Design a protein with these regions (language model features):
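Conserved short histidine dyad/triad with adjacent acidic residue
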Residues: 34-51
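Glycine- and acidic-residue-biased ligand/ion/polar-headgroup-sensing regions
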Residues: 52-65
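Well-ordered beta-strand positions in beta-sheet-rich domains
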Residues: 37, 74-76, 90, 98
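A short, N-terminal "cap"/entry segment at the start of jelly-roll beta-barrel domains
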Residues: 1-33, 118-133
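Conserved hydrophobic/aromatic positions in well-ordered beta-strands
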Residues: 36-38, 57, 102
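Short acidic-glycine-tyrosine-enriched beta hairpin
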Residues: 71-88
Length: 133
């Protein structure tokens, strides 16, 4: 059994300019997915495209908006609202006052990934070698 708390996740956190991602489970845990708690900093709009991963996201605190740039549409996010990027949609995630979301990635992240110029995470092998950018 894996049991981790917020302090454990802080040790593997990635702090980018627009958000902080605390990673609770990663590839080495063998779960087939990774679980992250991500805080979107106030006034941010993140342009993303997870071309190598699928992601499910549920808002747990604050409010924001998700805009689907691939299929169209925009939705308000508040605690309890989930969205899933089932077709690798390009999207913009934004929040005026800050928002915390719980994210599940498949395949799981290795750990140190951060977004590239396209807003995507590269795909790494178990040993940390790059498979696909």
């Amino acid at each position: 059994m894996i049991v981790r708390d917020h302090k454990d996740a802080e040790a593997s956190a990635v702090d980018e300019d627009k958000f902080i991602s605390r990673r609770y489970t990663l590839r080495a845990d063998g779960m087939g997915h990774s679980v992250h708690e991500t805080y979107i900093k106030p006034g941010q709009a993140l342009h993303m495209w997870y071309k190598n991963h699928k992601e499910s996201v549920i808002c747990i605190e604050g409010e924001g908006q998700i805009e689907d740039l691939t299929e169209g549409g925009s939705w308000e996010l508040k605690p309890g609202v989930l969205y899933a990027l089932d077709k690798h949609q390009k999207h913009i995630l934004s929040s005026e006052k800050g928002m915390t979301v719980l994210c599940v990635f498949t395949p799981s992240l290795v750990g140190p990934e951060d977004h590239d110029a396209e807003g995507s995470y590269p795909l790494y092998d178990d040993d940390g070698s790059l498979i696909k950018h």
